[in-house]
Amino acid sequence: MTDLIPLEQAHCLPRKGSDHKLGEARLAELLPQVPGWELAEAGMALTRTFRFADYYHTLAFVNALAWIAHREDHHPDLGVHYDRVVVRYSTHDVGGLSENDFICAAKTARLYDQGITA
């Protein structure tokens, strides 16, 4: 689906059932497209830690990320700390990772890279 356009420009689609769970080959194709992200939990989740100067910038990022999650209707698990946010994506309805996780990971990284919260 997202091979024709960059992940950060794609939009999430409803995904339910194990048919949409990504296999190892597809994970290996998509992971290089989201630098800095790591597979976690035996390939069941995608995680990355984002660092900030202070709590204000941390929360500004979280609020901007909440807008992306709402727009895409795909919501990460967040660990919010004073100077960092741990973002974890997984698609519960497929029992692992779907393309939606990689789309949102790319959008999250773009938000951070643009320095919107700086």
Swiss-Prot record:
Which CDD domains does the UniProt entry name for this protein? Answer: PCD_DCoH_subfamily_a
Specify whether Lyase is a keyword of the entry. Answer: yes
Single GO biological process annotation from the record:
tetrahydrobiopterin biosynthetic process
Xref: InterPro entries: PCD_sf (IPR036428), Pterin_deHydtase (IPR001533)
| Keyword vocabulary terms for this entry | Lyase
Record's family?
Answer: Belongs to the pterin-4-alpha-carbinolamine dehydratase family.
Which NCBIfam families does the annotation name? Answer: PRK00823.1-4 (NF002019)
Q: What is the protein named?
A: Putative pterin-4-alpha-carbinolamine dehydratase
Upper classification of the organism: Bacteria, Pseudomonadati, Pseudomonadota, Gammaproteobacteria, Lysobacterales
